[in-house]
Amino acid sequence: MTVQTAQIVKNYIGGEWVESISTKMEAVYNPATGEVIAQVPLSTKVDVEQAVLAANEAFKSWSKTAVPKRARILFKYQQLLVDNWEELAKLITIENGKSYNEAYGEVLRGIECVEFAAGAPTLMMGKQLPDIATGIESGMYRYPIGVIGGITPFNFPMMVPCWMFPLAIACGNTFVLKPSERTPLLAARLAELAEEAGLPKGVLNIVNGAHDVVNGLLEHKLVKAISFVGSQPVAEYVYKKGTENLKRVQALAGAKNHSIVLNDANLELATKQIISAAFGSAGERCMAASVVTVEEEIADQLVERLVAEANKIVIGNGLDEDVFLGPVIRDNHKERTIGYIDSGVEQGATLVRDGREDTAVKGAGYFVGPTIFDHVTKEMKIWQDEIFAPVLSIVRVKSLDEAIEIANESRFANGACIYTDSGASVRQFRETIESGMLGVNVGVPAPMAFFPFSGWKDSFYGDLHANGTDGVEFYTRKKMLTSRWEK
């Protein structure tokens, strides 16, 4: 599917591209230009019903398909993603807005997720104990659980779906995906390539839409589990409603990630990492560096370096060469971000770089320039809330103890980083910080697909995280077999 031909995005149900029964449509915009590039249907629960029934029917045979055969389809799928790498990256940039280089990297992360899922024969192995008692043996076997629902966000339209459905189907499940209505084109292309790889009809289905589709998945009795990535309020809603309907749920939510810079840090390295982590993907990622806590002795130096580097950032259409910072996703998100910048000024923070004044902000598209606040306190909204935009807050502290104390007061706990050369400081940070993914001299400590994406507190709802062995546990259930064999 190309942008030029995707005037109306269709649902993908039972291996067929079908129109939604809904007549309601929502425009899909190129956020760099404001141009409408497609129309996506706001599908209904009837559409969800059709997709779930197709997935449930496909489960009967797919769950019995030999695990190596499932893996071979995924290996072919991985190669097709590689073959179409540049096309996929361009499509991400057009509908999401991030720079082409970042989109290219996102495709890589998606491919890595498929590679991990293709290892299903090893991941699905059970356990055996031959002699739990005289002549008696016990074994554990893994089985798929059924139809899975996946609800994905706009900010990583390839990587997050590839977190979900490849591993789920590798484990023998079937899948109904609801991509973000803001970025549906990439999901459609993923389905086309899955079909080309030989994935049977009904194993992967896509229903486009908004609230009705989400509720349809959460309420349907044949949907056995829900994987969600998105904002904190919606994640909490999905978790509560899903579990009320007796579903297994993993819901990845918001973040307010703290980066701690100590006196012995390599400031050149710290500056480079923080700039990339704070302003990459326009700050629209749950691992973005949104708060820096820096020891007072080096605070002036760090702020000066950060502002100088932020001033060098090229802002514009992500398809243009040398652009680093693209737009935020929609005009209302741009206005929301400007509202947070206004509140930071009103609450007394020092605005040392004003992203409202960049030239690109005044033109077409939904641009906000890199914004840096100094002298931020934890009473301010810009410290408390997830802004999900290129806005960085700097808090000055007297010690590592104070920095950790401040970070731990946040209700979010996705990631945290420390910049230091001290092993003792790293150990203290590791043992006392309340966060699930940690970095040492690394700006974005997002793990590879074979490790769990492990947020804490209000950054995650559930027991089993996405990816890694947690993902395998989430998408499977166990049978225990105890046998007595006598001569």
UniProtKB/Swiss-Prot annotation:
NCBIfam families linked to this entry: MMSDH
Pathway the protein acts in: Polyol metabolism; myo-inositol degradation into acetyl-CoA; acetyl-CoA from myo-inositol: step 7/7
Top enzyme category: oxidoreductase
InterPro entries linked: Ald_DH/histidinol_DH, Ald_DH_C, Ald_DH_CS_CYS, Ald_DH_N, Aldehyde_DH_dom, MeMal-semiAld_DH, MSDH_GmP_bac
Protein name: Malonate-semialdehyde dehydrogenase 2
PROSITE patterns in the record: ALDEHYDE_DEHYDR_CYS
Keyword Phosphoprotein among UniProt keywords: no
PANTHER family reported in the protein's UniProt record: MALONATE-SEMIALDEHYDE DEHYDROGENASE
Reaction(s) the record says it catalyses: 3-oxopropanoate + NAD(+) + CoA + H2O = hydrogencarbonate + acetyl-CoA + NADH + H(+); 2-methyl-3-oxopropanoate + NAD(+) + CoA + H2O = propanoyl-CoA + hydrogencarbonate + NADH + H(+)
